[in-house]
UniProtKB/Swiss-Prot annotation:
Protein name: KappaPI-actitoxin-Avd3d
Organism listed in the record: Anemonia sulcata (Mediterranean snakelocks sea anemone)
Keyword Disulfide bond belongs to the record: yes
Residues in BPTI/Kunitz inhibitor domain copies: 5-55
Keyword hit for Membrane: no
Major localisation: secreted
Keywords: Disulfide bond, Ion channel impairing toxin, Nematocyst, Potassium channel impairing toxin, Protease inhibitor, Secreted, Serine protease inhibitor, Toxin, Voltage-gated potassium channel impairing toxin
């Protein structure tokens, strides 16, 4: 698994509302969350497909 996918979900400290996806280690799935627009980490993907490709999720 890509190391970025092991990072915790970080919403960020700003107040924007960008729909993003992150890899949830517990469920082993990519899940939607709302990103605030600043801060955060590399476990933050624009699309479900990108998250699944990078994190190796198998359907």
């Amino acid at each position: 698994i890509n190391g970025d996918c092991e990072l915790p979900k970080v919403v960020g400290r700003c107040r924007a509302r960008f729909p993003r996806y992150y890899y949830n280690l517990s469920s082993r799935r990519c899940e939607k969350f709302i990103y605030g627009g600043c801060g955060g980490n590399a476990n933050n993907f624009h699309t479900l497909e990108e998250c699944e490709k990078v994190c190796g999720v198998r359907s």
